[in-house]
Structure formats: C-alpha cells, structure tokens
Amino acid sequence: MTRSFSPVVSLFLLLLQTICSATVENAADCAAVGTLISSCTEFVNYGYPDPIPGSSCCDAMTVIGTYSDSSEKRKWLCNCFMDLINVYNSNATAISTLSGFCGVVLGFTIDPNTDCNFIQ
C-alpha cells in the first residue's frame, strides 16, 4: 500500500522548512510568518471558528513558537506580528489571541500597544 501526503500536509512541511531556514536579519522573513498565519484566515477575518490545538492554525502557531528561542528572535517576531496587526487592524484582537488559543508561548504579548524594543 502506497502512502501519499495530502496537499495540505505538503504545504505545511514546505512552510515549516521555510521558516526554520529563515534568518533573523532578513525582514522578508516576516512573509513566512504571514504565510503561516494565513492558515488562521477564517478566525482572523471572521472571529470563528476558535483555533484548537491540532488544527492547521495552531500547528502554524506552534512552528512560529519554535522560532522564539532568543531575545533577538522574539523582537523580530513581535515586529512581524505588529506588521500583521497594522495590515489587519480591524482584526487585531483575533491576531492577538492566536497564541493563547493554541497554547503557544511566544515570550511576548501580541497586542497593538506592545513595544517590541522592550522584549527580553
């Protein structure tokens, strides 16, 4: 019996590879964070369904969480999230609750008022 990956799993693995191979110095890497967050589109746009651990949205947040292992990377991720909040301002609350719904600790609070320069 031959096993095959679904297109969603293949895309997730490609995104995982993209973010894991990214460098902090490259501002274009925020696009990888945005791509991962795109799996949370319905929640960000409409406020439902709530993401739950094991969903594609929470899987994406887990990948992002693995990338917050230093102060420099947390500041970088914070700035990426602030950029997303600026673009999707009307949905800032949804974006700010993603890590909590998914049980992912990023080391900072996703909030429009967060000053990323003070993240440790």
UniProtKB/Swiss-Prot annotation:
One of its GO terms (molecular function) is lipid binding. InterPro entries: Bifun_inhib/LTP/seed_sf (IPR036312), Bifunc_inhib/LTP/seed_store (IPR016140), Plant_nsLTP (IPR000528). Pfam families: LTP_2 (PF14368). It comes from the Eukaryota. Disulfide bonds join 30-80, 40-57, 58-102, 78-116. GO terms for biological process: lipid transport. Residues 1-22 form the signal peptide. Keywords: Disulfide bond, Lipid-binding, Signal, Transport. Plant non-specific lipid-transfer proteins transfer phospholipids as well as galactolipids across membranes. May play a role in wax or cutin deposition in the cell walls of expanding epidermal cells and certain secretory tissues. Belongs to the plant LTP family. This is Putative non-specific lipid-transfer protein 14.
